């Protein structure tokens, strides 16, 4: 299963600040940017590369690495919470082409944990994805029921990219299993997997509403 939980001391340190309800809006956004950059570098370890030879200023030839896939990256930003996360990803992939998807889910407040939520895509602008060439990275800080992500994946899978990556900060166990059971070939990168969802579909312990905490 291509699931990567990046639970290193530095990522968990940043995540702890994100979870803290006393972290202010500016620092919340900055920490999302920091994690986006780190997760981008982790993704780069799975991209195609070639061994090359270069000559140093001292006239000595040496072997090196050229990550060829750095020229074949498309980042899709699920508005609005993913904006700082994508800012960090772009620091790792400065040549990436970008797309945006605006999606909203119908809020629920029942007695039981929702297994699916109605999602409406109100805006979509995605660059052409080259089949079996481009690596598509879909960014969303929180994967709860995975209803939004599955809706976006329906669009991306049709383009038949080389690889599809999902980047999140916190994912629920339910959401991860739901995505990877339907699309077992997808690479899912997250910092933490939380065990529960509440009756509104929010992750517990989570970090609250990422969009509201980042932008008010």
Curated annotation (Swiss-Prot):
Keywords: Allosteric enzyme, Glycosyltransferase, GTP-binding, Magnesium, Nucleotide-binding, Transferase
Residue numbers binding uracil: 203, 208-210
Binding site residues for 5-phospho-alpha-D-ribose 1-diphosphate: 80, 105, 140-148, 209
Metabolic or biological pathway: Pyrimidine metabolism; UMP biosynthesis via salvage pathway; UMP from uracil: step 1/1
Pfam family, one: UPRTase
Lineage top rank: taxon: Archaea
Regulation: Allosterically activated by GTP. Inhibited by CTP and UMP in combination.
Residues annotated to bind GTP: 30-34
Gene Ontology cellular component annotations, sorted alphabetically: cytosol
Top-tier EC class: transferase
EC numbers on record: 2.4.2.9
Residues annotated for CTP binding in this entry: 29-30, 37, 87-96
GO molecular function: GTP binding; hypoxanthine phosphoribosyltransferase activity; magnesium ion binding; uracil phosphoribosyltransferase activity
GO biological process, any: IMP salvage
Entry's pH dependence statement: Optimum pH is 5.0-5.6 at 60 degrees Celsius.
Entry-linked Gene3D superfamilies: 3.40.50.2020
Cofactor binding comment, as recorded: Binds 1 Mg(2+) ion per subunit. The magnesium is bound as Mg-PRPP.
Family per record: Belongs to the UPRTase family.
Complex and partners: Homotetramer.
Function: Catalyzes the conversion of uracil and 5-phospho-alpha-D-ribose 1-diphosphate (PRPP) to UMP and diphosphate.
Protein name stated in the entry: Uracil phosphoribosyltransferase
Species the sequence originates in: Saccharolobus solfataricus (strain ATCC 35092 / DSM 1617 / JCM 11322 / P2) (Sulfolobus solfataricus)
Source organism phylogeny: Archaea, Thermoproteota, Thermoprotei, Sulfolobales, Sulfolobaceae
Gene: upp
């Amino acid at each position: 299963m291509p699931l990567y939980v990046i639970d290193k001391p530095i990522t968990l340190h940043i995540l702890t600040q994100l979870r803290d309800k006393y972290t202010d809006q500016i620092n919340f956004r900055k920490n999302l940017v920091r994690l986006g950059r780190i997760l981008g570098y982790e993704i780069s370890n799975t991209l195609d590369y070639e061994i090359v030879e270069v000559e140093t200023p001292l006239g000595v030839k040496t072997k090196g690495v050229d990550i060829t896939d750095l020229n074949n990256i498309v980042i899709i930003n699920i508005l609005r919470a993913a904006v700082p996360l994508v800012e960090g990803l772009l620091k790792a992939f400065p040549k990436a082409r970008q797309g945006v998807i605006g999606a909203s889910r119908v809020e629920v407040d029942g007695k039981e944990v929702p297994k699916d939520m109605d999602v409406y895509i109100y805006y979509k602008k995605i660059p052409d994805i080259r089949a079996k060439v481009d690596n598509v990275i879909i960014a969303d800080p929180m994967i709860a029921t995975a209803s939004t992500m599955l809706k976006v994946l329906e669009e991306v899978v049709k383009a038949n990219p080389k690889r599809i990556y999902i980047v999140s900060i916190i994912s629920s166990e339910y959401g991860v299993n739901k995505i990877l059971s339907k699309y077992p070939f997808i690479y899912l990168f997250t910092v933490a997997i939380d065990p529960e969802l509440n009756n509104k579909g929010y992750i517990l312990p989570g970090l609250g509403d990422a969009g509201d905490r980042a932008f008010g």
